[in-house]
Amino acid sequence: MNISYNWLKRYIDTDLGAEEVARILTDIGLEVEGFEKIETIKGGLAGVVVGEVLTCEEHPDSDHLHVTTVDVGTGEPLQIVCGAPNCRAGLKVLCATVGTVLYPGGGDEEFKIKRSKIRGVESLGMLCAEDELGIGASHDGIMELPADAVAGTTARDYLRIEDDYLIEVGLTPNRVDAASHIGVARDLAAYLRSRGEDVSVKMPDVSAFAPDNHDLGVKIRVENHEAAPRYAGVTVKNCKIAPSPEWMQNCLRAAGINPKNNLVDITNFVLFELGQPLHAFDAAKIEGREVVVRTCAEGTPFVTLDGVERKLTADDLMICSAERPMCIAGVFGGLDSGISDTTTDVFIESAYFNPVWVRKTAKRFGLNTDSSFRFERGVDPNMQVYAAKRAALLMKELAGGEISSDITDIYPAPIEDFRFDVSFARIDALIGKHIPEETVRAILAALEVKVLDEKDGVLSVAVPPYRVDVQREADLIEDILRIYGYNNVEIPSRVRSTLSYAPKPDRNRLMNLAADYLSANGFTEIMSNSLTRAAYYEGLESYRAENCVRILNPLSADLSVMRQTLLFNMLEAVQLNANRRNGDLKLYEFGNCYFYDEAKRSDENPLAAYSEEYRLAIAVTGIAVPASWNVQPQAASFFTLRAVAEKLLRRFGIDIYALKTETLQSDLFSEALTMALNGRELLQIGTVSRNIRRKLGVKQDVFYLEMNFEALVKSTKKHRIVAEELSKFPEVKRDLALLVDKQVTFSALRDVAFATERRLLKSVSLFDVYEGDKLPEGKKSYALSFILEDKTRTLDEKAIERAMQNLTAQFERQCGAHVRA
């Protein structure tokens, strides 16, 4: 947001210099990102003075040049060669002396005046045309001044050229109230008043507003009060299109707006003055003399000011005549209804549009205008009538118009102040410093915050509705601190905090640990969109369609919901690569998943229905180990992925023997299991079902793991590295074949083994699984290998046999297992 220092001083009476103003604005939260000195005429015409042509003779060696003597107020006339056809004795002109730098046409290209000889005659300056000075476009001849112009007067003084300072304020999205010169002046005045200065904001006087006649009545009808809570309008007739005055053009250029004509410039001027967007319609183009605020039928074509035809939706608020749409409300005008060179009668629109409606429409059409920027953040709902009066009076003054109607103001449900309580104790607690109560009251008064009641150190306050960023106690305390001054809160010399903290798992460190391990083992990280297709979730039980978080204004049907699982993103990546003959894949992805649960929603806390989880997905497909001269190719399998999962969990310090592993019945997988620790599910792993693969056109088997990374972080234990002396005594290996029911898992047997022989059992592994006709129905065979070791002595056969008998007995008692002969 560009703020002109000269323009700002129209509304606040202060002797502060531009640099001091910029410093204060930064201190109170309106960060100044740029500061630049500017001139209404580039270069300020330094070295250009008023001159009087004393003599004008023909050049001895040219039929179109003149040799002149010019009085520039120094007492010694200058000889200057001039080729202008209107050069003559007695003329008052603007003369550029030697050394002057001009910027012809107001551009960036310099032109320096030098002592020179023109066809043998010395010339000590230049008599200037308008375009050479950068103050106009005419080059028909030298610029003629009135006869009363005094020779020697600097062009800067004669033309009243002023220096200005451009202050570029980086507005945060919540401070739309400061998106105008009045808004910035209001903040500056609050700062000065809180420090005892008698300063107030001088609002432009609109008391002279009164209709000159009632010849141009326009009826206004609002059909959608939700989208347009307030709509005001007034007409001005018999306007004359002309350039706006120099002072207004200078203001607009400082704000970054190119002047166009007086009517358009007035609406832009009021926008940057008051922060209220206006729209001026050519009243002659309003059919039926009626303005209707409504939506149009889906697909209605509409041509905007840029000449582009756009298809409207039923959710786009439009400003219409009795017959057709004329303007996209709060966003962009129409090509056939705006101000043109033939306009004489004007309808001025001044409205408050619902920010949500404007934001959705602006995003839908990809339009970002000065008006939509303000409307979608929330303009002052009490400024509309004032702004309409201001614009109408300016059109009367600068375009010779006649105010031809009363102001029509449709405002059925006035927007009230934001009301809440704030306590002095809470102010001190949040700021970290005691601020005297009188200082707080002074700041609140300076911010135009009304104190409705005070009791037991608690203030009941009313905040003006133009401060859309201050709607609760914490917001107001931030505003108090902003005006009080961040730099006035001292940094304490001592930190009141314990120096010992309970160690907490670092999610980022664990992410890096997982990523390093997976990447080192041939996996490739992918990154996919959090938005996905709603069709993926239709008919699923694992992730129901009604639990999707839906986007209100999706970019396309393919990106209409937030993902509940990373599975579909992973399958899209597999399908994309497989179609390009890259079917051997090992992939992983970190990402958030999003959920909606209507049962958790309440009027007091509607956001409780929404939740998200951070997850890690891993997938393998195709060949896991490629062939080489000494290795046969190995296809990816469920066990390939399970091995990766267990190694990853070990790296996180999780005892995999403490995991509870259960079979998972899911419509996502043809076979799967879950791993949980202390009742908290950590991951699901399985073979993706054919039905799911068919949805995405994936033909090959995909083995997939999805880990709840947040649960994993909470389950992680810090590694304690303990050095142990290597055992001097040998290990003993024993194998055992067990006949068990099909539902018995190796994990269950392993848990029983370690619970039975904690002292001697070093490890247990599964090296064979057999199911076939030679076994009873419902049975399978596990071949287990046990490593036994005693750190204090060499195991004898008696101790080994006793340990194996204990294991066999517990397997039979707890798992129904029998030793195979």
Label the predicted regions.
Residues 119-134, 138-144, 155-165, 169, ...:
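Mobile "lid/hinge" segments at catalytic clefts and subdomain interfaces of large enzymes
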Residues 188, 192-222, 399-427, 433-434, ...:
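Terminal amphipathic helices with adjacent charged low-complexity linkers/tails
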Residues 2, 442-452, 469, 473, ...:
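A carboxyl-terminal module marker
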Residues 116, 292-332, 336-339, 495-612, ...:
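Class II aminoacyl-tRNA synthetase-like tRNA-binding/catalytic domains
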Residues 49-80, 152, 249-250, 267-336:
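Conserved mixed alpha/beta core segments that line enzyme active sites in large multi-domain catalysts
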Residues 420-585, 734, 787-791, 799-821:
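Extended, well-folded interaction surfaces typified by the phenylalanyl-tRNA synthetase beta subunit core
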Residues 1-212, 347, 366, 370, ...:
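Phosphate-backbone binding interfaces of nucleic-acid-interacting proteins
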Residues 5, 23, 27-28, 40, ...:
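Glycine/proline-enriched, intrinsically flexible loops and inter-domain linkers
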